[in-house]
Design a protein with these regions (language model features):
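Nucleotide-activated chemistry modules centered on ATP-dependent adenylation/adenylyltransferase
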Residues: 3-8, 12-458
Length: 458
């Protein structure tokens, strides 16, 4: 233990008049032989009036951090709802089981999963099996799963002109799709699109009226549905694109590999903004509620995350306006990777199939932070999707990587892909994953474990 602790990197967080010494074991230094320290089973505290304090006091080194500073959480039983933001990755799953070990009743917990693809009709950025993996976990544990998304997801946002698509979620009790309040810019863009159709109709009338069904003929002058209702509609929309762009902007480029959500819009617009919209619009969380948001960021993942607060006031907190208290708890922030795997091992949870094929992080399948080896693996397991991304680069004139196109990016790289786990290969390729697959008696570390944290969100 002493030898391993010597490899810890000391980090100091400057706070008002004091420095807090932190010992952080980076994921790249964590191995299968690293001792389990924080990942041991927790003792129940729910219902005992115990407030949770952070292991390291929160930052107060700027106005922003002063505003969100929180010295301690409420006792867990005082929250009306505890939301676990869950991606399917090991860290967020460990958060869920930590809550159970602390004694939180399952009926008090909801798993919130943000579907990065948003029901896009043809394109996918995430793993094919992630949605079924999440459903299998929720069903196996008997907890509610609330899936939320921005309509048309990553590729809808990538090719966006005008305002972003609305945020929707699926009610876990009824299966009904609910929609958050539409933005004023989105409504204005819709008006422009409807105006296009009206202008097209007026234009058609100048050349005569049909008032009869199209003929079943290869002659487009008689099969007028194709000629007048597709080609001309497209032309009308194109003529109004400048106005749409003026109202809502446009993307037409991949997210930046930066630390801010503005440039890295996949995290900002498809995850954080989605979660905030659902919290503010959901009847169960809208007002007169105390909510705890639990997420799985860890200090060992990156230099940026090493500076995160364990607890803080969440950005959707609205005590004055809606009497809504929202706190955030990164309950595994000080865990090592070994600690996290220990939690999954203790509960016999089958890791997401991507870990079992060699991926060290459960991000999107084609995550913008992928290393050359990870992207090489993606090109091998999903060759069609890889080709589509290359076509996107050509079409947009903008590469996924900051400096080179995908072919150059992966050239000469050693693929991460390991095909030994046939069940995982099947799940990744087909998307199939059932309740019967979620627990395993003979638990083993996946091949992607202990390969550092490069290749995922930082």
């Amino acid at each position: 233990l002493t030898c391993i602790l010597k490899r810890y990197k000391n980090r100091r967080l400057k706070q008002k008049g004091m420095e807090t010494l932190m010992e952080v074991l980076k994921d790249k230094d964590c191995t299968i032989n690293t001792p389990v320290v924080l990942g041991v089973q927790d003792s129940p505290i729910y219902g005992k009036g115990i407030s949770i304090k952070p292991r390291v006091d929160g930052r107060k080194d700027s106005k922003h951090f002063e505003n969100i500073y929180l010295p301690e959480l409420l006792p867990l039983e005082e929250y009306d709802l505890i939301v676990v933001l869950i991606s399917g990755g090991k860290d967020s799953i460990a958060c869920f089981y930590k809550l159970l070990e602390l004694g939180v009743p399952k009926e008090k917990i909801e798993l919130w999963h943000h579907d990065i693809d948003g029901g896009h009709p043809s394109r996918r950025m995430d793993w094919k099996c992630t949605q079924n993996y999440m459903k299998a976990l929720a069903d196996a544990e008997g907890v509610k799963l609330r899936v939320s998304y921005r309509v048309n997801g990553f590729f809808g946002e990538l090719y966006r002109i005008g305002a972003s698509e609305p945020v929707e979620w699926v009610d876990p009790d009824t299966g009904e799709i609910k929609q958050c309040k539409l933005s004023s810019n989105y409504l204005k863009c819709q008006e422009i699109k409807e105006q296009c159709l009206e202008e097209m109709e007026d234009l058609l009338k100048e050349y005569g009226c049909r008032m009869k069904f199209p003929a079943k003929s290869p002659d487009l002058s008689r099969r007028w549905c194709s000629a007048y209702l597709k080609v001309m509609v497209a032309d009308s929309v194109v003529s109004n694109l400048d106005r749409l762009e003026e109202l809502g902007g446009k993307r037409h480029k991949f997210p930046a590999k930066g630390g801010t959500h503005q440039g890295r819009w996949c995290s900002g617009n498809l995850k954080a903004a989605v979660q905030d919209s659902v919290t503010a619009n959901l009847e169960e969380t809208k007002k007169d509620k105390k909510i705890l948001i639990v997420s799985g960021e860890r200090r060992g993942e990156s230099a940026g995350r090493s500076k995160y607060n364990e607890i803080e006031i969440h950005r959707t907190n609205a005590e004055k306006r809606n009497h809504r208290i929202v706190h955030q708890w990164r309950c595994c922030i000080d865990y090592t990777e070994k600690d996290v795997w220990e939690v999954l091992k203790r509960h016999h949870v089958n890791p997401h199939p991507c870990y079992r094929l060699g991926w060290n992080r459960c991000s999107c399948a084609a995550c913008i932070f992928s290393t050359p080896g990870l992207m090489k693996g993606f090109s091998e397991i999903y060759p069609d999707e890889y080709k589509e991304l290359r076509d996107d680069e050509e079409r947009l004139g903008f590469t996924l990587d900051n400096k080179k196109n995908l072919d150059d990016f992966i050239c000469g790289a050693k693929s991460c892909l390991c095909l030994d786990d046939k069940q995982a290969v099947h799940s990744i390729k087909t998307g199939e994953f059932t309740v019967d697959d979620i627990f395993v008696d003979d638990w083993k570390y996946p091949v992607g474990a202990f390969h550092g944290s490069d290749g995922g969100s930082c």
